[in-house]
Amino acid sequence: MDSATRQHLMIAFFLSFFTVGIPYWRIPYNTVNLPEALPVFGLIVVGGAAMMLRLQTTATFWQIIKVMTASVPAAVFARVVWDGFKDPSSHNLWPFEIAVVLPVGFACAVTGVLAGSLIAAMTGKPQRRKKR
């Protein structure tokens, strides 16, 4: 993976991390109900960023899925850590929180990557293959 691809993946990860995280972090902890508490706009950004990565970078299908999927549980885990500093007993079941949002992030990432692959195929853009 070249440095430009790595940079694009990092930018897309943090863009998705903050668009999911900031609205989610503002919800009071006692009213959070996952996965409904995740902002729809943030999840759309995850899929859109995955689609753009597929169209514009040399990152592979699975690299994009792994990075973009991780952005959603990372935002939830950041809240777990922050709330854990304030009240150590607040997130006793944090592994379940991660397990609940992981499929949501995966679904958004896969949808975006598949859409990007479909658009690339329809426009005649060559698919980039990983060099061996």
Where do the language-model regions lie?
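Transmembrane alpha-helical segments of multi-pass membrane transport proteins and ion-pumping complexes
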Residues: 17-21, 46-54, 76, 109-117
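Loop-to-helix transition at the N-terminal end of transmembrane alpha-helices
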Residues: 30-48, 69
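Interfacial non-cytosolic loop connecting adjacent transmembrane helices
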Residues: 29-35, 75-101
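Alpha-helical membrane-associated segments of multi-pass integral membrane proteins
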Residues: 90-132
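Transmembrane alpha-helical segments of multi-pass membrane proteins
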Residues: 66-77
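Alpha-helical transmembrane segments
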Residues: 6-21
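Canonical alpha-helical transmembrane segments
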Residues: 42-66
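Short juxtamembrane and helix-loop transition motifs at transmembrane-helix boundaries
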Residues: 1-3, 20-34
